Amino acid sequence: MMLGWGLRGFIGGGPFGAMIPGAMVALTLCYLYPRRDVSVIAAFAAVGVGIGGEMTYGQTIGFIVKADTFWWGFLGLALKGAIWGALAGAVIAMGFRPRPLLVLGGAVVMAVATQIGWKFINEPKLIYFSNLLDRPRPEIWAGFLLAALALVGYLAWQGQLQPALRFAVVGFIGGGIGFGLGGSIQGLGRIFTPELKLHWWKYMEFFFGYCFGWALSWAWQHSETPDSGEVGAGPGDAIEMLAGAAVTAALFWLSWNTQSRFAYSLAGGAVLYVVSRCRWMAKHVAYTVTFTGVALDLAKYWSKEYQRGPAGPAYAAAVVASVIFGWYVIRWNGDTRKTLELLMWACVVDAVVKFAIHPSGIVNVVDHVCIGFVLMAAAVSWMMRAEIIAGSCEPSSSSAPSAAAMGSPSI
């Protein structure tokens, strides 16, 4: 998740960018602890982590990088990170028994609670962690805090107290530590060593991802995580490709056009309900949507931000790349390792290309962050392949990697 979060901050911000670490951490945990409903868990994790991406925190970081407002910035980042982790944990827990009525009820509960918190705390800015004097941002953290509490309560009422409470509480702790201390790394670095032109923001993201991933892995190891069973085959490759394209387009369109401060949360809840009804759609929500966001981000930077070429061909290429990616998602359905490597390396290659097309020149690919992305992805691939080779040498081992062989997850 450390790699996923670092990528999220570079190749796709907002909720769609946050789906990258969500999908990657779910795939990693399902690889370490094999189960049959991998794509369903990955969909709930991708959307659950993605929801927190609707929170604004750029101006909160603006506080932590100044000595006189450091502690207010620290409090704001720690609180927002904790809420991010708690809500994501609760949504993931809902994915362990994704009955349609349960998911529909959970989506409604989250929406109502978010609206209450937004309307009575965030909109009037009663407690505010952004800059009131300079383009004040519409915060949503209180709405998501109430959403997390309401969803845990709802899942407890539905008989899922243990995983919901444990994932939410541990996510709250890991997210709070990760974002609070991660922000401190950036703040203290820029306050005391302003002459060093380092990627302080990226170091913050890596640390946040590490702590968030650790929290989710601990919760996974110490919670009841029932397997909801086989996802089932789709209606045929051609129809599934069309359906995958439709749900991908719908999630983007609803998120961009719904007149709400938490449009992605509303759209994500609707899509998760679709997943609970048509479980074969889960892989496209978890992986195809995530990659499409990455591809569209690169097209935007190529055409608008870096002005390397016209927008039309760039966005057309992004759509074609997403279709090809979706086809491989169908082809490798059921192979957790291949799917994880597909998503991970597609994102890393996209990041390398984005470094290369920067106006300052292709020399950017030797940036230590770019090199770090490649090395971390290579390390993940090497560890998975080393485990397969080691397992094949044991006469009684199964083809699926075991958690015992891998040790406790380091995500």
Language-model regions, residue ranges each:
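Membrane-interface interhelical loops and short amphipathic "cap" helices
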Residues: 3-11, 59-72, 123-136, 187-202
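Hydrophobic cores of alpha-helical transmembrane segments in multi-pass inner/ER membrane proteins
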Residues: 19-30, 79-94, 141-154, 206-224, ...
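Transmembrane alpha-helical segments of multi-pass membrane transport proteins and ion-pumping complexes
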Residues: 1-5, 23-27, 49-61, 85-93, ...
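Cytoplasm-facing juxtamembrane segments at the starts of transmembrane helices
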Residues: 36-48, 95-117, 131-142, 160-178, ...
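Short, intrinsically disordered terminal tails adjacent to the first/last structured region
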Residues: 390-411
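Long, internal scaffold/assembly segments composed of regular secondary structure
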Residues: 176-269
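Alpha-helical transmembrane segments of integral membrane proteins
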Residues: 2, 15-20, 39-41, 254-396
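N-terminal signal-anchor module of multipass membrane proteins
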Residues: 1-63, 69-74, 78-91, 97, ...
